[in-house]
Swiss-Prot record:
Coiled coil: none annotated. It is an enzyme of class 3 (hydrolase). SUPFAM superfamilies: EF-G C-terminal domain-like, P-loop containing nucleoside triphosphate hydrolases. It comes from Nitrobacter winogradskyi (strain ATCC 25391 / DSM 10237 / CIP 104748 / NCIMB 11846 / Nb-255). GO terms for molecular function: GTP binding; GTPase activity; guanosine tetraphosphate binding; ribosome binding; translation elongation factor activity. GO terms for biological process: positive regulation of translation. It is a peripheral membrane protein. CDD domains: EF4_II, EF4_III, LepA, lepA_C. Pfam families: EFG_C (PF00679), GTP_EFTU (PF00009), GTP_EFTU_D2 (PF03144), LepA_C (PF06421). The lineage of its organism: Bacteria, Pseudomonadati, Pseudomonadota, Alphaproteobacteria, Hyphomicrobiales. Its EC number is 3.6.5.n1. The gene is lepA. GO terms for cellular component: plasma membrane. This is Elongation factor 4. Belongs to the TRAFAC class translation factor GTPase superfamily. Classic translation factor GTPase family. LepA subfamily.
């Protein structure tokens, strides 16, 4: 039996910006409560970040959970359930469901860097879930740490009292015992009724080669027992529970989980897509009818085409995507073909980091070499006959004459930056058609709120923001609504043929600059052929930019010494005819580098 008195359970998550020491603090808590022995911890950083990419980039992608036992100073034994949540905006939905499973949060802030944009976003989510929040200042042993200033900042920006914030250094373990005591004394226990009908929240799920789908749950009411039959309200599928248990971070099996507890179950579920995150699990024999509040399915925001560089890898790519989908239900894909790139997939992602990580996992775990087309967003179009359509691939755009109005998605962005870079950050937002909403100062840092079109952000906004602010600015966004926009479909023509992989929807005012930059880049990278190749950027039938790749010259008159000029002219005319014919029928080989470079062009 695992069941602990509900008053001695504490469910909490750690909220922090990337790199503020969240996973390191989790390591220390596990070590000090004896979750793993020192030998098992040795040489392992970030125990909860199980993917290589998570460790390398120092970010948490999947939510993880661990149960710790702690004997407090009052002599009682407590059970802590720690949910390690992702810190990045793309994984905000993973954060929201992890927070819904907890009653309190530790807010970790780097004492040398202060509050960042994503700290704000996640704290507001925690406050929305009525969490009790304990501020923790990490890295206080650094020479650059300014704890008093950061405390003031927490109070000014977030509006929670930070006077009794816990001072720690997660790396050395300084102050971590105080965190354990604060969890006991300052965070509330869960509520729940053991005798009520079973009601549990599905927090996360992942695929395990041996066990099938492992489902992470938080029991709200009732008890979840091994061998019982459960039903998911969202998909109305029923399963027999095979295993029940929790992580310490190792898997430990038990007979049942009671109210307020967090653990896992396995039930011969075949696909992660069958387990919707945020779904409600109940008893199949006497089900509850209403779902737990506040969950929505993850909707892809950014789309792009992924094509294998080597056409023979297509089947491998298809299998790899299926495997990734097992673990990441928010990632969607469908097959597409491109005249330039062959067979591939059109994929949907939650945001740019998600796109980058999926791409990196495909190339790293499955050894695939991929080309990604330009990222695009979902546009809404009202046609002249009153029909409304949504498109996420510029190739599918109907004829201009049939379109009455195009609408594009807008976001609200919150940007925090040191004062000295404010000018260049504001200029960047202005260049990207941003509309400033507010500008406030927090100590020596400025906080700007902007409305921006998502179209302008998906491309390379984050990279540009980091470069104009020397890496100091942080950025967070959420979708707001759709607004009408003057967008045009720009195509790149090589030797008069449109290259489908390079067509994109751009704002009319930006089309010329974008088109010119792309054709110049293509000109550098397409090798000369026997005939000259025009590279054009066009909107409809109007060419807005053009470059020409000069032909290779073969000296056909070399074998004529002296003699009549008409002989030379005849040979030159013949060559001219041949080149003309070649230009008509010749095929231009566009190297992969040219695609990749054209897609990475700056405006």
């Amino acid at each position: 039996m695992t069941t602990s008195p509900i008053a001695n359970i504490r469910n909490f998550s750690i909220v922090a910006h990337i790199d503020h020491g969240k996973s390191t603090l989790a390591d220390r808590l596990i070590q000090m409560t004896g979750g793993l022995s020192d030998r098992e911890m040795a040489g392992k950083e970030q125990v909860l970040d199980s993917m290589d990419i998570e460790r390398e980039r120092g970010i948490t992608i999947k939510a993880q959970t661990v149960r710790l036992k702690y004997r407090a100073k009052d002599g009682k034994d407590y059970v802590f359930n720690l949910m390690d949540t992702p810190g990045h905006v793309d994984f905000a939905y993973e954060v929201s469901r992890s927070l819904a499973a907890c009653e309190g949060s530790l807010l970790v802030v780097d004492a040398s860097q202060g509050v960042e944009a994503q700290t704000l976003a996640n704290v507001y989510q925690a406050l929305d879930n009525n969490h009790e929040i304990v501020p923790v200042l990490n890295k206080v042993d650094l020479p650059a740490a300014e704890p008093d200033k950061v405390k003031q900042q927490i109070e000014d920006v977030i509006g929670i009292d930070a006077s009794d914030a816990v001072m720690i250094s997660a790396k050395t373990g300084l102050g971590v015992p105080d965190v354990l005591e604060a969890i006991v004394t300052r965070l509330p226990p869960p509520k729940g009724d053991r005798d009520a009908t079973l009601k549990a929240l599905l927090v996360d799920s992942w695929y395990d080669v041996y066990l099938g789908v492992v489902v992470l749950i938080r029991v709200i009411d009732g008890a979840l027992r091994k061998g019982s039959r459960i039903r998911m309200i969202g998909t109305s599928a029923a399963y027999d529970v095979e295993r029940v248990g929790f992580f310490t971070p190792k898997m430990q099996q038990v007979d049942e989980l009671g109210p307020g507890e967090i653990g896992f179950i396995t039930a011969a579920i075949k696909e992660v897509a069958d387990t919707r995150v945020g779904d409600t699990i109940t008893d199949d024999r006497k089900p509850v009818t209403e779902m737990l509040p506040g969950f929505k399915p993850a909707i892809p925001v950014v789309f792009c085409g992924l094509f294998p560089v080597d056409a023979d890898d297509f089947e491998t790519l298809r299998a790899a995507m299926g495997k990734l989908r097992l673990n990441d239900a928010s990632f969607s894909f469908e097959m597409e073909t491109s005249a330039a790139l062959g067979f591939g997939f059109r994929c949907g992602f939650l945001g740019l980091l998600h796109l980058e990580i999926v791409q990196e996992r495909l190339s790293r775990e499955f050894d695939l070499n991929l080309i990604a087309t330009a990222p695009s967003v979902i546009y809404r179009m009202r046609l002249t006959d009153g029909v409304e359509i949504e498109i996420h691939n510029p190739i599918d755009m109907p004829d201009v004459v049939k379109i009455a109005e195009i609408q594009e998605p807008w976001i609200e962005a919150t940007i925090l930056t040191p004062d000295e870079y404010l000018g260049s950050v504001l200029k960047l937002c202005q260049d990207r058609r941003g509309v400033q909403k507010e500008l406030t100062y927090v100590g020596a840092r400025a906080m700007a709120k902007y409305d921006l079109p998502l179209n302008e952000v998906v491309f390379d906004f984050y990279d540009r923001l980091k470069s104009v602010s020397k890496g100091y600015a942080s950025f967070d966004y959420h979708l707001t609504d759709y607004k009408p926009a003057d967008l045009v479909k720009m195509q790149i023509l090589v030797n008069g043929e449109p290259v489908d992989a390079l067509s994109m929807l751009v704002h009319r005012t930006r089309a010329e600059g974008r088109g010119r930059a792309m054709v110049e880049k293509m000109k550098e990278l397409i090798p000369p052929h026997m005939f000259q190749i025009p590279i054009q950027a066009a909107i409809g039938g109007k060419v807005i930019a053009r470059e020409t790749v000069r032909a290779l010259r073969k000296d056909v008159t070399a074998k004529c010494y002296g003699g009549d000029v008409s002989r030379k002219r005849k040979l030159l005319e013949k060559q001219k005819e041949g080149k003309k014919k070649m230009r008509q029928f010749g095929k231009v080989d566009i190297p992969q580098e040219a695609f990749i470079a054209a897609l990475k062009v700056d405006n």
